[in-house]
Amino acid sequence: MAQDYPLEELSPRAFEQLTVALALKVLGHGVEAFGSGPDGGREATYTGPVNWSATTGFGADSWDGYVVLQAKQKETLGTPAQNASWLLKQVSEEFDSWLANDSKRGRLPQYIVFVTNARLSSVADAGGIDQINASNRQRISAPVPGSDGKDSLAARGLRAAKGLFGHLVGVMV
């Protein structure tokens, strides 16, 4: 029987460490972890191939490049809709930080993974998981405000973003 882990009870640092541990398990020893303190929006980075499908081999679901992993822990969980709203705001702020002219984030990733304890609805199209994924695709391709329409996260090199949500993180633990 599957067990639910109360991930919201972890300290912020412990949740970041869990994020790094999961990255090491999934991606291997090429993961570079960052310690406490300012991390430029990165808990860990990885450069290389990422196969998201354990059954199909390296293919359409695969990534190959510079990946940033970020932990997004919600201390008090709400309804799936509240959790989705919170996570949409968190992810949007991260994209805004990468786009800021005065950003101190350094190298823009080709891929980004948001690891969160937020439990989201899996209802097709309307659920939080699909909302986050659609928002990520839209933000990556959307023109930067005030640009001539040619500047976007995609134009700067970001190819995809993925969320590992509460129910998935709990299964991986």
How would you describe each model-predicted region?
Residues M1-V173:
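Mixed-charge (Asp/Glu-Lys/Arg
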